[in-house]
Amino acid sequence: MRAVFDTNIFISALAIPGRRAETALLKVAEGGLQLAISQAIIHEVLDVLARKFDRNPEELSRVAVYLSELAEVVTPRRRLKVLRDEPDNRILECAATAKAEVIVTGDQAMLALGEYRGIRILSLKDFLAGVFP
C-alpha cells in the first residue's frame, strides 16, 4: 500500500514520541508500507519543528535526511487548489503524483473531503486499525 502522511502526522511522531503517529512511522520503517513525501511536505515539517518545537539546525538536518530515506520523494508537477489551506493542497498533490491509495491526516478539512480522485483520506486511528490491526 502506498500512503502519504500529512504534516501533522510527522510532527506528532517526531515531536511527541510514544503516540500513534510514532507507531505509524515505525511500521513504515519496518517495511510494512510504502510512504511518499514531497519537498514541500518536508519543508513544512521542518518549519513547524523549528518554530513550534525550537529544533536546532542540526536536528532539522537529521529529520530531513530521515524523511528522505524513509519515504519516496516525489515531485508534483501540477498545483492543486482543492482545499482552502494551501499546505493541505500540497498533500493532495503529493498523493496524486505518487499514486497513493491513502492519505493519513488529523486535519478536519481533509477528513471531511473523505476521498480525492480515488485516494482515501483517513484519520490516523482508522488507518492503523485498518492496515495494522
Regions found by a protein language model. Give the residues of each.
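Hydrophobic/aromatic ligand-binding patch that stacks against planar heteroaromatic rings
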Residues: K27, C94, L113
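A secondary-structure boundary/capping signal
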Residues: F5-T7, I37-S38, G106-D107, S123-L124
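Alpha-helix N-cap/helix-start and coil->helix boundary motif
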Residues: I11, I42-H43, M110, L128
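PIN-domain endoribonuclease scaffold, especially VapC-family toxins
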Residues: L26-V82
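Active-site neighborhoods of divalent-metal-dependent phosphate/nucleic-acid chemistry enzymes
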Residues: E69-I103, Q108
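Acidic, PIN/NYN-like endoribonuclease modules and their adjacent C-terminal/linker elements
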Residues: Q108-P133
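Short, well-structured N-terminal submotif of metal-dependent ribonuclease cores
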Residues: M1-I37
